[in-house]
Amino acid sequence: MADKGTDNFDLEGNNWYIVHEAECTDSIDTLDDLCDESNDDSNISNLIDDDVVDQGNSLALYNAQINEDCDNALAHLKRKYNKSPEQAVAELSPQLQAVKITPERHSKRRLFQDSGIFEDEAENSLTQVESESQAGPSSQDGGGDINLLLLQSSNRRATMLAKFKEWYGVSYNEITRIYKSDKSCSDNWVIVIFRAAVEVLESSKIVLKQHCTYIQVKIFGFSALYLVQFKSAKSRETVQKLMCSILNIQEYQMLCDPPKLRSVPTALYFYKHAMLTESSVFGQTPDWIAKQTLVSHQAATTAETFELSRMVQWAYDNNYVDECDIAYHYAMYAEEDANAAAYLKSNNQVKHVRDCSTMVRMYKRYEMRDMSMSEWIYKCCDECSEEGDWKPISQFLKYQGVNILSFLIVLKSFLKGIPKKNCIVIHGPPDTGKSLFCYSFIKFLKGKVVSYVNRSSHFWLQPLMDCKVGFMDDATYVCWTYIDQNLRNALDGNPMCIDAKHRAPQQLKLPPMLITSNIDIKQEQSLMYLHSRIQCFNFPNKMPILDDGSPMYTFTDGTWKSFFQKLGRQLELTDPEEENNGVPSRTFRCTSRSNSDSY
């Protein structure tokens, strides 16, 4: 029987590397001393990593791995079951469609349709989902899950336009005009709301009344069509913010554009909807609908041919002479007058405006020439609605040392146009109020100003043909020399020849002239031939200035109106009503209208 335990082999000469048992050592008592002893004698450093272990975000790594596996599985299923569209090859290249690797084989005819378990499973599932969505109760009231549809669709506006045409029976673009800018303003707006609460839509009929003069609302399920006319013009941004705050919706649930105001089908569409029981209407029908639908308004706008005489009469009655004033105000008048509307539709607006301005100037020029100076002054007083006091004129003349009686005597001869007394010169140092005093006088009498700077032009005196009083400011010595050499007849008050633009030289008497200067020509012997043709007043004192920088003496149209009304008898001015025994003259009429006050 063999001995149990370790068998000893007799290996002679090899006993040095065979260890039969552990040797006991008394020099090291504990395990720690043994570890310290071994570390001290070791030649390998940092063999053991004693740092704190960082676990990391293992859950995120696991989720990323799971997502990657799911994506790979879905991609494999899509490649397996989804068929590529047949037209994809033709869309890529028509020539590529002709290239075929496998030969063409005719498909076998089948008596019965395939069960679709293998090929048509995806198509059947899609068809089933569509049928379920169509059978839902929400689609019957026009609402549906329109929010989800709008979010999923690539073109939200196209989806909303299609739904609008399906629900309301008309294309949205046929009744609206597109504003490219959201900041363009309009009074009338067409607003379409998608997927809003019915209660909120009903309450909006009351809330919008404080903002609008006309409201037409038609609610179709969870959608609504608004035609509103605001009290003031609003932009698309303002309208969208207002509707979003009232209905608690988002901007993508809304279509907002102004209606076609000149479209008869658009007017008839909203006029028809206003009579339906489903529609709620507040306010009076807008004018753009009434003019195109109601018989009375259509009869009032039947005369669509433009008449220049009516335009001239309107400009004459409203005292519009400049071309810019006529063009702007007559365009605004198109909402009230058919002839102005026909003017806007005309392609010759510039010609009409130019002709109208020319005719009005001719009529006004003849009336001015036909009036005496007294009639003209009282006409200016009647047209001035401002009230004032004539005392600042008297106080200012007294401040400058001018006797009021002497001034009235000279002014009386000046207004009558007596020869040799047809020109008043006010001279003195600078800042004495000469120009302020004369400009206010010329403004009230609607005079014209000529400037010596334009002397090189042949027509620089032409403005004096259209006024009752002329004015030249700040005449220098060179200017006086020119007047002495060329314009003695103008100061005499006798007829002279004036070169006018686009016409033959005109023979007429120049109006009384008012001139300011810093030179006292009475002291200039070289201008002695002008001494008998002018009447001078000296303003030696500077104009007093208040603390705010304004002059102490101010002269307005009301001041001169009060001056002529107060001192009319002293100036020998006669009231036209007294000459006609209180009977007013007949107003001018250049068109065959029945009522002269219709404008």
Swiss-Prot record:
There is a cross-link at residue 509 (Glycyl lysine isopeptide (Lys-Gly) (interchain with G-Cter in SUMO)). GO terms for cellular component: host cell nucleus. A motif (Nuclear export signal) lies at residues 92-101. Its EC number is 5.6.2.4. It is found in: Host nucleus. Its main location: host cell. Keywords: ATP-binding, DNA replication, DNA-binding, Early protein, Helicase, Host nucleus, Hydrolase, Isomerase, Isopeptide bond, Nucleotide-binding, Phosphoprotein, Ubl conjugation. Disulfide bonds: none annotated. Residues 124-144, 575-599 are annotated as: Disordered. The keyword rRNA-binding does not apply. A motif (Nuclear localization signal) lies at residues 78-80. One of its GO terms (biological process) is DNA replication. ATP binds at residues 428-435. ATP-dependent DNA 3'-5' helicase required for initiation of viral DNA replication. It forms a complex with the viral E2 protein. The E1-E2 complex binds to the replication origin which contains binding sites for both proteins. During the initial step, a dimer of E1 interacts with a dimer of protein E2 leading to a complex that binds the viral origin of replication with high specificity. Then, a second dimer of E1 displaces the E2 dimer in an ATP-dependent manner to form the E1 tetramer. Can form hexamers. Interacts with E2 protein; this interaction increases E1 DNA binding specificity. Interacts with host DNA polymerase subunit POLA2. Interacts with host single stranded DNA-binding protein RPA1. Interacts with host TOP1; this interaction stimulates the enzymatic activity of TOP1. This is Replication protein E1. The gene is E1.
